[in-house]
């Protein structure tokens, strides 16, 4: 019977310890080879938590699927911070250009609840609120209103 293991690992730095080792060890496969493969596939997401799905079939063949990091991790990497604000409504820790928000939305579009780029960008900007990041030097809620009013349509269509 095929087994599927879903884990969140640091990009490019997964280890044979928890959560991967204990999940794969009983399946009788080479955990080190799997970890090395995961590290190669997640190297571009260095410093971010990356969702990884490991499927092991009856013949012990391993298939590794790498997801896209959470929106929060992408926003923080783009801004260059390691942690979000402890008090996001009063302490601002960085600024995200609207173009970067659009880029993140395009990356995450398949995983989001949104069907359109405009609403996906709004989701990314909503994440900025909870992390304590401004967008184009303004409060995220001001940008959300401007997007709804159509002021950023040219950026969204580019």
Curated annotation (Swiss-Prot):
Q: Does the keyword RNA-binding apply?
A: yes
What domain of life does the UniProt record list for this protein's source?
A: Archaea
Mind listing the UniProt keywords for this protein, alphabetically?
Answer: Ribonucleoprotein, Ribosomal protein, RNA-binding, rRNA-binding
Q: Name one GO cellular component term.
A: large ribosomal subunit
Q: Which PANTHER family match?
A: 60S RIBOSOMAL PROTEIN L12, LARGE RIBOSOMAL SUBUNIT PROTEIN UL11M
State the NCBIfam families in the record.
PRK01143.1
Record protein name field: Large ribosomal subunit protein uL11
